[in-house]
Amino acid sequence: MPQDIDFGLPAPAGISPGLEATRRHNLGWVRRLGLVGDGPSLAWYTSWDMPRLAACGFPHARGAALDLCADAMAFFFVFDDQFDGPLGRDPARAARVCRRLTGIVHGAGPGPGADACSAAFADVWARSTDGAHPGWVARTAHEWEYYFAAQAHEAINRLRGTPGDMESYLQVRRGIAGTDLPLSLGERAAGITVPAAAFHSPQLRIMREAAIDVTLMCNDVYSLEKEEARGDMDNLVLVIEHARRCTRDEAVTAARGEVARRVIRFEQLAREVPALCAQLGLSAVERAHVDTYLGVMEAWMSGYHAWQTQTRRYTGAPHVLPSTGPGYFDEVLPT
């Protein structure tokens, strides 16, 4: 597994205080809601260190906000693993299961006797939206819908058995990675709301997409061995290998180039943002929110990168959960 690949991303600028308190909260939360059982399941989950990811990726978060970020990360990864088995090779079942989750986004509620994933997501969504700006709720609801809907398309790609083209890969991968959602969670955790005129400017839209792609592309390299063994096709290295008919080393080098180009573009556009804010006539408070949001995006890229290069989720997966079986100990998303 190419865990020693260096993408040249900066170290995290900071880490949220209160990490140990959030560790205690998060462990209690996943057990109370049934996301994680006892024994090997609990030991495996604990080794991922979701609270550390939250503290590094969301340095603006404090207290309950940091707890929410850690719980959201726990949901993401436990939910994702449920598709590393029969469900992930059955597009119709995947779509049906994910409709339940999408219904929660649109107000349906999990219902009595809900499965652990539905109950956990309902809790995360309720806490995220409590007191949030309506604009934030609207666009974050769309992001969750995209995330859930993309699961069926990843299943379709697994059945195809060969990587797709770059454009199709990005459409599915951006969905299943859900990496636009941490940016929105980071915005919420920082206590800001980016003005719509700035949020939808070419500069911030391109920067946001770059931050999303950097995160998922680095992850594709670090999780390559795990994903290839399970027949996943939506991986940047595999897509490049297939399209260019090149070697593994050449594909990894090309993947690093894709990341580097996006980091450079992000930095270029960041320098344009002060003038953009002036042109839009933003107030001092609004400009401060935009500036903080740039920090949110930077923190997520560097914080996630720092976490994924150390977590046992990627270094230990082939030994803990061999690819001959499902990628989880507990089935918490019944169909």
UniProtKB/Swiss-Prot annotation:
Mg(2+) 1 binds at D80, D84. InterPro entries: Isoprenoid_synthase_dom_sf, Terpene_cyclase-like_2. GO terms for molecular function: metal ion binding; terpene synthase activity. Mg(2+) 2 binds at D80, D84. Binds 3 Mg(2+) ions per subunit. Its EC number is 4.2.3.96. Its cofactor is Mg(2+). It catalyses: (2E,6E)-farnesyl diphosphate + H2O = avermitilol + diphosphate. It comes from the Bacteria. A motif (DDXXD motif) lies at residues 80-84. Belongs to the terpene synthase family. The recombinent enzyme produces avermitilol (85%), accompanied by small quantities of germacrene A, germacrene B and viridiflorol. This is Avermitilol synthase. The lineage of its organism: Bacteria, Bacillati, Actinomycetota, Actinomycetes, Kitasatosporales.
